[in-house]
Amino acid sequence: MAFVPVTGAIAGATAAAAYVDAKFHITKDIRGIRGQKAAARALEKNSQGKGQSLWYQFETQVRRLPSTEECIWSRTGCYTWAETYANACRYGQYLHQNGVVPGQLFAMYMMNRPEFLFTHLGGWSIGSAPAWINYNLAGDALVHCLKVSEAKVLIVDEDQECRQRIEDVRERLEGELGMTILVLDNALKGEISRTEPKRPEDELRVGMKGKFPLFLFYTSGTTGHPKACPFETQRAAGLTGRVGAMGLKPGPNGDRWYVCMPLYHGTGGTTALVCMVTGLTCCIGTKFSTSKFWSDVRDSRSTAMVYVGETARYLLNAPPSDLDRKHNIRAMFGNGLRPDVWQRFVDRFGIEVVGEFFNSTEGVMALFNGSRGPFTATSVGHQGFIDRWRFHNTYVPVEIDFATGDLVRDPKTGFCKRKSYKDGGEILVQMPSESAFVGYWNNPDATEKRFERNVFKKGDLWYRTGDALRRDADGRWFFMDRLGDTFRWKSENVSTAEVSEALGSFPGIQEANVYGVEVPGHDGRAGCAALYIDPAHRDSFDFNALLAHVKAKLPKYAVPVFLRVQKQQTTMHNNKQNKVPLRNDGIDLRKLMERADKEAKEQGKEEAEYDTMYWNPAALGAGKGKTDGDSYVVYTMADWDLLKGSKDVEGGAKL
């Protein structure tokens, strides 16, 4: 009967192992590590020794899937895998015949449509890769992005507004940059469609490996213009691994991923490419629309969706409907899903899996949370014991001076102060060498600024993420704040320096100090500009002319929603602009007046001078009863009270 205690011992050991696994999430970590290795092996296998180009991954899916299986769905046209492959070959030939050569980039200024993917895949087919240009950009910022890319060929969307923005700078693009501009209108699309879909030779793709980019995309910084980041070919396994982590199934009859985020944007564009190289159907939405979102999802038979934080809030703000669960979406993938939105969205729309990720555009730090329940809800990443051990001295929180943005260093040792993961701080990432960070494309100065040296010991090298996060005892990572000047609005990064430059070029403005402010009922921060206007121009200053001026120079999401006209210029001791008190005041006029009263008292003044604030209600969907359209009007305490009271009303701040 000795087997009885043995059986009991086995049962006890099994229970103990299950407890340890549940507490420390060992299996989850091992599954993640194996998944990444499997993705890397698949890339190597599908290339068949011909190189690392993801073109071969795409071809593998084309061969594997039935020719009648749908590859791309859109309102403007649907395409099977065979049709998509033929079009990619045609576009590759056209690009090659018109100056795009292997090993060099070309540029795409295109909206969400199947031709975006035909063009991108066509570039891969000939050993090239695209620079994704934000189609909202105009003027100097647009020229800057194209110049940085060093592309000599620009593919332009047929949309009339896109074409006009290019026409406005055509002379500079052709003269200064030597670019060939090709507008993908109906005539050109017809010409390309009539060519024979001949497969480009393998020799064209031999250079697509290692650090050669799969694409170039842009991030707003504090230098005034977007910075370009290459997504290296050697990072491809990180892309394809997300499919398994989300529990998605490739075709035939597999999952269908709805993407209405801009394809020039990292989240939207990479998801579309993942579909192409893993065998999922990509369902393309022209742009995000609360009213059209679910009809697109239902008509496309999508089973997964892409989001940014604001997307979920906007959809949640729509009135409840009997159709809320009449869809096939079971998984959603993206970033920035706010804690106050997360569970309400999941419960209302019946979502099974939320794939929330945190990643710097530069690709230095990556976290992922495949949440299937309340335990990991609201976290941007989750690490079990193994991953916590692996990254303990790689992802490190440090103390920062929030007023200056500088790392806090010990006055005696000169080294930084490490924070506990529980308390959190700005996350630094240890770098084995400078070459480990791919850096910004053709911008070594900006690359150098992301490094921090001698952090914990002499000679060490770290990358500053510019983001504050914390991690709890269960391995869940939570986003705390975005540090520095750049802020997010309408799911885009807004560069304060770029906005300041646009404002400063308007007659009468002597100084523009730009920062982001929180608005009740809205994700991110809206742009606010503290202006010091030349006294000679104050009485005749035209605020609506200013609005027209900045709208012509900036993307729509970067145009300031609020203006604060200052009585006095405010600088720090070193003549740098001081954003901290302005940001703390926000748009609450009571706080603004309280601080002014306090400062007047400290300075012995009998009466305080108050700044005047203006706003554009239409930019928040709050124009009803205020104005007939876009315009800056005086902002009052009553407006603030209404904004606070409307945060739970449909559509955010709708007055």
Q: Each PLM stretch: what is its role?
A:
Residues 80-82, 205-207, 214-238:
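Conserved AMP-binding A3 loop
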Residues 237-256, 264-304:
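Conserved AMP-binding/adenylation subdomain of ANL enzymes
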Residues 47-51, 68-121, 138-143, 234:
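Conserved AMP-binding/adenylate-forming core of the ANL superfamily
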Residues 2-38, 97-98, 121, 125-193, ...:
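Structural core segment of the AMP-binding/adenylate-forming
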Residues 67-70, 183, 197-218, 225, ...:
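Conserved pre-ATP/AMP-binding loop-to-beta segment of ANL
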Residues 277, 302-307, 316-400, 437:
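Gly/Ser/Thr-rich phosphate-binding loop
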Residues 137, 143-144, 154-156, 429-461, ...:
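AMP-binding/adenylate-forming catalytic core of the ANL superfamily
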Residues 180, 513-519, 528-530, 543-655:
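Conserved C-terminal "lid"/linker of ANL adenylate-forming enzymes
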